[in-house]
Every structure is written in C-alpha cells, then in structure tokens.
Amino acid sequence: MTNITTENCAALLDILREKNPLVHCITNYVTANTVANGLLAAGASPVMADSPLDAEDITAKASAVLFNMGTLSKDRLRAMLISAQKAADMAKPIVLDPVGAGSTDNRLRSTMQLLRQFRFAAVRGNASEISALLMTSPITMKAEKGVDSAETTLEDKISLAKKAAKRYSCTVMVTGST
C-alpha cells in the first residue's frame, strides 16, 4: 500500500487535470451545483444529467459515473440502472453516495438493488448510511432520520468501512457528521 503524501496527492491532481475526464453525475438537485463545482475545481468535466433518455449515451462518453441517492425518483433510479449497465459493459468506474439510505424503505431498497446488480469502484457515506447498507445498527448509533449521521467513534467508522468494503468489494469512505 502506498503512503498518502502531499506530493502523491499533488501528482494525482496534476494527472486528473491533464486528463480532464468527463464525469456523468446523476445527483440530487440539492447538491448538483456543489458537486459540479467540486469536479471542475479538481480538473474534471461534470455533466449533470438524470434523464433515462440520456443515461446510456452520456455514460458511453464519460470516463466515470457518480450516483447520489438524494431526492430519489422513479426516473432518476431508472437513469441510474441504465447508466450502471452501460458503465459495467464498458468497465467504467461508478461511485455511489447513498444519501439517507436508512431514512426510507424506498431509498434502502433502491440502493441495495444497485449494489446487488453492479460493482462500484467506491461508496461514500456517513456512518448511518454505511450502517444501513450493512443492515446493522451499532449500539452507539441512533436511528437515521434523514441525511444526518449518528454519533460514532473513529473506531466505529473504521470498522464500518472495512465491513462494507469487504461485502461490496470496493473502496468505502465513511465521512463525518453532516
């Protein structure tokens, strides 16, 4: 495993900016502007497109795909399924942000459908969201109400990340409270 250093990060950022990858984002309207600006600042070119009619074509042109489960709708889920299939067919990485995964049955069911059907390069979420994906509820955690995270220790987050990474065969990042 390579140690993460400032120099390594700077070199990777230079490569990212040189390649200027197109990233197909199917995200929620709450964060679309922030996500687009973050990708632009990093050197990528985001395309914010959540229509099932565009999903296959845009994913075919993209270098990577990002799914955000916030403000989930039937059409947005359909677009994700179409996009994920195209990304899988073309071996393109997909990142999943399971926003509020444990807050409703629909979000959890939809997120689990994606995780069962497709391989993700990475999943990022707060402790409550990752716990929901593992169908666990550590004693230190409260029930998830929305996109807020339960109080957890660093050790809890590390344990959740390791368990989820093993289960879903991908990189898992457990973020702090939102």
Show the residue positions of the predicted features.
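Glycine/small-residue-rich loop that forms an oxyanion/phosphate-binding "nest" at active or ligand-binding sites
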Residues: 68, 76-125
